[in-house]
Amino acid sequence: MPHDQKALVLDFGGVVTRTLFETHALTEMALGLAAGTLTWRGPFDPPSDPLWQAMQRDEITERDYWRIRTREVADLTGRPFTEMADFVKAARGADPDAVMRPEALAAIDAARHASCKLAILSNELDLFYGSEFREQLAFLKDFDVIVDATYTRILKPDPRAYQHCLDKLGLPAANCVFVDDQLRNIRGAEAAGLRSVHFDVLTPRQSYDDALRLLGLPLLTQGDMT
């Protein structure tokens, strides 16, 4: 393998997909809820979401946060959502492509055409989204590596999670750029030697531009995302 081979390593939820916070209107429509029923906004309005704030203080895990939200939506709809994947499948399963970030797809395409390797490093890809959702996403076939803690049981920011991904890529950490929306995971990646971008869900294009810049690639244009 060329010594200058590079890789783009992405978290999935929130980074490749739009967050559930951004798609409340779609969720409400899909689940038959009145518009405005879902009011939790996470990073888009932290003061109004105490549960999100508790997660940011490490008082609960991200899985805990979504487990609680899933139960709340189950109660609202009367549906038996026992797992996060049940909720996501009902809310998004009809059209998974509609919740993909166009910036993500453009950056993935740019990295692929520049012969960069592609990897997903997720704590909960199939746990939260379900394998059926994943299998509908054609662009994932372009990925060289998918590491999902649903199966490995090793959650970021555990150093072993990053090393497992690097081992599967066959690359040193310095050759990889990692993108994640959780600061704890960014700190873990940096401790493992990866160059990292803390993804900002408020400015997704800027975050992907930062990642492409670290890879030495051209920045996104508006035409890339159409």
Protein language model features and the residues they cover:
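Alpha-helical elements of Rossmann-like donor-binding domains used by nucleotide-donor carbohydrate transfer enzymes
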Residues: 22-26, 50, 64, 68, ...
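Asp-based, Mg2+/Mn2+-dependent phosphohydrolase catalytic module
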Residues: 1-10, 121, 125-226
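A short acidic, helix-capping loop that chelates divalent metal ions and anchors anionic groups
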Residues: 50-54, 128-130
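A metal-dependent, Asp-based hydrolase signature
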Residues: 52-88
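Active-site neighborhood of HAD-like aspartate-dependent phosphohydrolases
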Residues: 1-47, 191, 203-206
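Hydrophobic alpha-helical core bundles mediating ligand binding, dimerization, or RNAP-core interactions
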Residues: 24-27, 65-70, 88-92, 128-132
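Short, surface-exposed acidic
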Residues: 31-44, 74-90, 217-225
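Short, acidic loop-to-helix structural element flanking the phosphoryl-transfer center
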Residues: 4, 78-119, 159
